Amino acid sequence: ENGEPLGIFRENALELVYSKALTPDKESFKKMIHEACKALNSYGVTSAQTDDFVAFPQVDYEVLIAAYQELEKEGKLTVKINQQAQLVNIEDLKEFIGKGYKTGVGSDYFKIGPLKLIGDGSLGARTAYMTQPYNDDDSTCGIPIYTQEQLDEMVEYAHKNGMHVVIHCIGDKIMYMVVEAMEKALKKYPKEDHRHGIVHCQITTKELLDKFKELKLHAYIQSIFLDYDINIVEDRIGKERAKYTYNFKTLMDSGVITSN
């Protein structure tokens, strides 16, 4: 602020921190995964979705894939894993698909799931990307991670190469951008059961809710966010916009496939 560092890192600036973090090796990954499986099994959980590829950005994703595959061969992967492939740019996506990976590739216990993208930030940090400025800070509309052109390119490439696409969207502006990218891809390469979707779907509009049904998008709603964000939503975006937040029942009643 005013040219002075505050010690706060937001969105892409976090790469400066991640790049200095310790780098686990494959055996360390195997130990962490095995311990996580045991914890999940203790609660009766037998399948999970995860997006591990950028948990340690300095580690090649094939090291992580190998860790899962070796655990499966050893009989220690006791939770069925669907790996949401978080790849941050078009170059990484092209390389990934070029190596033969896409949605559905794998075994009964470890499969590649959808391409996972992070579209914006969070409501609490005012980094969710909004069409209008924040109610309690009119100097910002939040932070988009991608431009429209970048989203268009990545969504189209994944779609035409057999990958489902799921994108984290909190704010309404980023949701408009993502819906536009998905609509363009579907018009260019029509596919009935595409299974593309939006994660969180927090701050919507009637137009966006209608688009979910029209394009047959899935909604990954994650209602646990209500525990925190419901207490700040009116402060952040005002009462009028708050009417179109967490409209999960509306989505379900309209026939949109939702999951938690």
Q: Model-predicted segments: where are they?
A:
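Short amphipathic alpha-helices and their capping/turn segments at secondary-structure boundaries
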Residues: E1-G3, L93-L115, T204-K216
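Extracellular/periplasmic catalytic domains that process cell-envelope and extracellular macromolecules
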Residues: E74-K76, T103-Y109, P190, L251-D253
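Polar interaction faces of repeat-based domains
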Residues: E180-P190
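Divalent metal-binding segments
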Residues: E1-G98, G113, L117, S122-I174, ...
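Structural detector of well-ordered beta-strand residues that form the stable sheet scaffold
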Residues: N82, V166, G197-V199, H218-Y220, ...
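Active-site-adjacent C-terminal substructures of enzyme catalytic domains
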Residues: I203-N260
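Active-site environment of divalent metal-dependent phosphoester hydrolases
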Residues: V54-P57, G171-Y176, I203-K206, L226-Y228
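Aromatic- and carboxylate-enriched substrate-binding clefts and catalytic-loop regions
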Residues: H194-T205
